[in-house]
Amino acid sequence: MSSELMFNYTFSWPAGPKDVILTGTFDDWRGTLPLVKTAKGNFEITMPVKLXNKDDTFQFKFIVDGVWCVSDSYKKEHVSEGIENNFLQITDLVETQEVXGASRIPEAGGLLCGKPPRSAGPPSTSNRKKNKRNNKKRKSKLKKKSTKNNKKSNESXDDNEEEDXVTGTTTEDVTGTSREETPLAEPTNVSKEAPGNFHILPIDQSADTTQSNGIIGGPGPVLVPNPGEIKEFTEIRDVDARELNERLNKKEEVPEPVAGPIVESSVTEKSPALPQADDPIVETKEMAHNVQELTPQVEAVTPLINELEPLPTPEAQISIPESSKVEPVEGSLQSKLVEKRESTEGVSDGSKKVENKAKKDEEVFTLDPIVNKAPKLPLTDEQTAEGRKSPAVSEEKEKKKKQEKGSKEVKRSETSKEKKPSAKEVKKQTVKAPKKQTASPLSSSTEEPKKKKTGFFGKLKKLFK
C-alpha cells in the first residue's frame, strides 16, 4: 500500500493584481493553475496536496502579473542562491482540515465529498417554533380520530418534544407516521444496557394482531372461530348428475288440464248473441235473387249485340235499324253496352280492309327494261267508297291495270310531261266532310248526341266509310 498523504488546501493571494497563477512541484513549475478572483477582489483556489510521507514538504510559488514571487503568509525556504520558494508541512495541512469523516473522490483528485461545514452557535429558534406549531396542529387532529392507544402515543410524543427543547434539537417529521400511531412498548432501563449493544424492543403479540381480518373481502384469509359447526366443511356428497336431472325432470312433468269442456261452455254462453248476425245474411240472399231476375234481361241484349257484328257494306248498316226494333230494357245500361261494342267491331273491320287495300296496291316488279312508270294518283273518297260498295268495281280496276301495263310504252311521253301532285293537293283530297251523327236506335230519344273524341281508330273508321 502507498503511504502517500492527501489533504485539501486553499491557496490565496490578496486583492490588487489582475492575474495570479499557482505553480510548484505538482506541475513541474510550468504555471498551469490560475487562481480564481472572488467577489471581495482577492484570489483563491482549493486543490489536493499530496505528501509522500510525514517529513515531506509541498513547495510552490505564485506568478503575479507575469512576475515570479513568494507570499509572506506562507513559510519560505531557500533552495539555492537567489531562489526562494514557499512550502507546506504536514502540520500546516492538518490544522486546516474541516471535517474528519468526509469522504474523498479519487477521480476528482481527492476532493472532499460530504456534508458542508456547520456554522457555530446555537440552533435557530424560528425553525423550532414552526415545528412546534405544526406538531400541535397534527396532535389535535390525531386526538379526535385516535383510540385509547393513540392517546398514549400522543403523551409520549409530548415528552419527546420537551426533551428536544432542552437539548436544542427538533423533530423533523411533520406528517403522522405509523410509528407514532402504533402503541409504544413499555420503557426499559437504559442504564443497565452496555454502551456497545443495541436495544431490541420486545414483540407484543396481542390477540388483535394475530387474528386475521374476519370481514369478507378484507386482506388475508377468513378464519372462522367455529369451523366444526358449519356443515359445508364436514358434509361431502357424491351426486350423479344424470340421475339428479332425470329425477328432477320427472317431478316437473305435470299433466296438462283438458280444455274440452271449457270450450263448449264458452260457445254455449256466446250462442244467444249470434242471431244479430243473421240479418245481413238474409239481405244478401235477397240481393242474389234480384240479380238472378235481371240476368234474362241482360241475356236478351246479348243477341242484339251479336247481330251488329257483320258491317261489310252500307246495305248491312241500313238494315240494322229495321231489325233492331226492340223495346229498350233499362235504356241507359243497354246503350252503354252497345256503344262499347260498336267501337271495337268497327276497328276490327277497318283493320281487315286496310290489309286488303295494301295487298291490292302492291306493285308487280318485273325484269323489263322499262324505267319510267306512270305515277299512281291518290284515290279520292268517292273512288274508295265505290270500291267498298260492290266487288264488281274492284274487278274493273284490275282490268284497267292490265290495259295500262300494255300501253305503258305509248304513254311514256305523256307521263313525262305530267307533274306529280303536291303535298297540299294530296291533303286537300284526303280531307273529308264531317260525318253526320245518327242517333242509335237503342238509345233513348230524349238524350242529346254526345261528341266523341276522334282518335287513331276513329280516323281509320272515317276512311273506310
From Swiss-Prot:
Q: Where is the composition biased (Acidic residues)?
A: 156-165
Which parts of this chain are annotated as the region X-DNA-binding?
160-161
How does it get modified after it is made?
A: Cleaved in the vicinity of position 160 to give an X-DNA-binding N-terminal subpeptide and a non-DNA-binding C-terminal subpeptide.
Record key words, sorted: DNA-binding, Phosphoprotein
Question: Where is the sequence biased in composition, kind Basic and acidic residues?
Answer: 337-363, 385-398, 404-428
Query: Record's Gene Ontology CC terms?
Result: cytoplasm; nucleotide-activated protein kinase complex; nucleus
Q: One MF term from GO for this chain?
A: DNA binding
Where in the sequence does UniProt note compositional bias of the Basic residues kind? 127-151, 451-465
Positions bearing Phosphothreonine: T182, T295, T366
Q: Which residue windows does the record flag with biased composition (Low complexity)?
A: 166-177
User: According to the UniProt entry, which residues carry Phosphoserine?
Assistant: S153, S156, S271, S319, S343, S394, S440
Matching CDD domains: E_set_AMPKbeta_like_N (cd02859)
A Gene Ontology biological process in which this protein takes part is: signal transduction
Start and end residues of each stretch annotated as Disordered:
107-227, 247-275, 312-465
Q: Does the keyword Transit peptide apply?
A: no
What is stated as this protein's family in its record? Belongs to the CRP1/MDG1 family.
Q: Per its database record, what is this protein's job?
A: Cruciform DNA-binding protein which exerts an enhancing effect on the cleavage of cruciform DNA (X-DNA) by endonuclease VII from bacteriophage T4.
What is the protein name given in its UniProt record?
A: Cruciform DNA-recognizing protein 1
Gene name for this UniProt entry: CRP1
